[in-house]
Structures are given as structure tokens and as C-alpha cells.
A protein has these predicted regions:
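Short acidic-hydrophobic, aromatic-tinged amphipathic segments that line or gate anion-handling sites
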Residues: 11-14
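Metallo-beta-lactamase
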Residues: 3-7, 18, 25-30, 35-110
Length: 110
């Protein structure tokens, strides 16, 4: 009985696309696995990545949703996130903040 709204994108982001937004330089990292269209956002000047539901502190995102894939999420993390500098701070969508170095050393999925 409730009204619903359908939203349409004004722009579509692409892997490795660079954006300047609100004084920040951001690189889009397409990281499928949790969902086919999953992305992380890397701020190189701040040395920060927002990993959403891709990478968590000593864990990874769920892949049991339609379109999710454990092999894709591991590949995404290894190819896109583990190539970032060790001191990069990772802000996941849930739980504790971590670093790329910490995940390289202690994440059992990697």
C-alpha cells in the first residue's frame, strides 16, 4: 500500500575512474564479489579506502546473495586493495577500521 520511488543514475562510474568531489580526489575501484557492481573508493592523498562490504577487519563481505561470488571477492581484494600502500586506512561498511598491512598479515581469507 506504500508508494515507492525508482531512482535513475545521472552518471555511471567506471573502474579506475578518477573524481574530484568536494575538495577530495577519489579513485573508483570496481570490486565485484559481494555484488557484481561493488565498488570501493580510494582517496590517495588521504591514504584512505572506503571498502563497503568488500573487505572487513580480518574478514570479507558475504557472497551468498544473488550475483555474489567468493572467488570474485578474493580476486578483487587481491588485485585492487592489496596493491594499495600498507599504511592505507580501510574504513569498511561494518565493524572495526583496519589497514591494508593488517589485512595482508592477518586476514585468513587472503
Amino acid at each position: 500500500t506504500g508508494e515507492h520511488h525508482v531512482f535513475h543514475a545521472d552518471i555511471y562510474l567506471k573502474d579506475e575512474q578518477e573524481l574530484d568531489l568536494a575538495g577530495f580526489h577519489i579513485r573508483v575501484l570496481h570490486t565485484p564479489g559481494h555484488t557484481p557492481g561493488g565498488c570501493c573508493y580510494y582517496f590517495p592523498y588521504e591514504n584512505v579506502v572506503f571498502s563497503g562490504d568488500t573487505l572487513f577487519c580480518t574478514s570479507v563481505g558475504r557472497t551468498d546473495f544473488p550475483g555474489g561470488s567468493m572467488s570474485d571477492i578474493i580476486r578483487s581484494i587481491k588485485e585492487k586493495l592489496m596493491t594499495l600502500p600498507d599504511r592505507t586506512t580501510v574504513y569498511p561498511g561494518h565493524n572495526d577500521v583496519t589497514t591494508i598491512e593488517n589485512e595482508r598479515m592477518y586476514n585468513p581469507y587472503l
